[in-house]
């Protein structure tokens, strides 16, 4: 697809479809011969379970992952990153670290995310069993100017993916 590495950063609420699209994109890029790695919020948190959910913890976590993504990018590896990354300031910090940063906002209504709640996290947050849960009792700050917005409420996974690949093809052929 491209010879220049980039960081493709998916952001959005839990259950928006970030990981689904990110995993599909990694397969697509690898099949196209592109060197790439997936950094996924759930996977990384399983490796580092001590990472908390306070604003400070989340900011530090996103910045660490951004630093890792920028290192991989510098070494010619495209990074597909899937993190809720709820705060604009930390996403903007990551953007500045990366040479070729593409922010993909997976815009999905809270209602849709709650319907998709395969992990049961929204139910636990609504019952007060989980606190500082993004979208319930902790804010999500939508990007102001993402390179791409995908609205998974209104699109199938395939439609969203085609929109994503179409955008990436268009921007890499310029």
Listing of model-derived features with the role each one plays in the protein:
Residues 10:
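Hydrophobic anchor at the beta1->P-loop junction of P-loop NTPases
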Residues 23-67:
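Conserved substrate/cofactor phosphate-moiety recognition/catalytic segment
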Residues 47, 51-52, 69-126, 132, ...:
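ATP-dependent NMP and nucleoside kinases share a basic, alpha-helical "lid"
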Residues 38, 101-103, 147-149:
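Conserved beta-strand scaffold positions in the cores of enzyme catalytic domains, especially
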Residues 107-110, 115-163, 171-174:
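Small-molecule kinase domains that catalyze NTP-dependent phosphoryl transfer to phosphate-bearing small molecules
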Residues 14:
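The conserved Walker
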Residues 1-7:
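Extreme N-terminal, non-catalytic leader segments
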Residues 18:
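Conserved lysine of the Walker
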């Amino acid at each position: 697809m491209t010879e220049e590495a980039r960081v493709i950063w998916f952001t959005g609420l839990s259950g928006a479809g970030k990981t689904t699209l990110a995993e599909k994109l990694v397969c697509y890029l690898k099949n196209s011969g592109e060197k790439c790695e997936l950094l996924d919020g759930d996977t990384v948190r399983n490796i580092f379970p001590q990472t908390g959910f306070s604003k400070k913890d989340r900011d530090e976590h996103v910045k660490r992952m951004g630093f890792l993504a920028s290192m991989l990018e510098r070494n010619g590896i495209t990074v597909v990153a899937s993190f809720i990354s709820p705060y604009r300031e930390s996403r903007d910090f990551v953007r500045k670290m990366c040479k070729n940063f593409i922010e993909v906002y997976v815009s999905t209504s809270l209602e849709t995310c709650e319907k998709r709640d395969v992990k049961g996290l929204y139910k636990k947050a609504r019952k007060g069993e989980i606190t500082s849960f993004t979208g319930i009792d902790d804010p999500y700050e939508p990007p102001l100017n993402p390179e791409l917005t995908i609205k998974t409420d209104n699109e199938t996974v395939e439609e969203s993916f085609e929109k994503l690949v179409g955008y990436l093809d268009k921007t890499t052929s310029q």
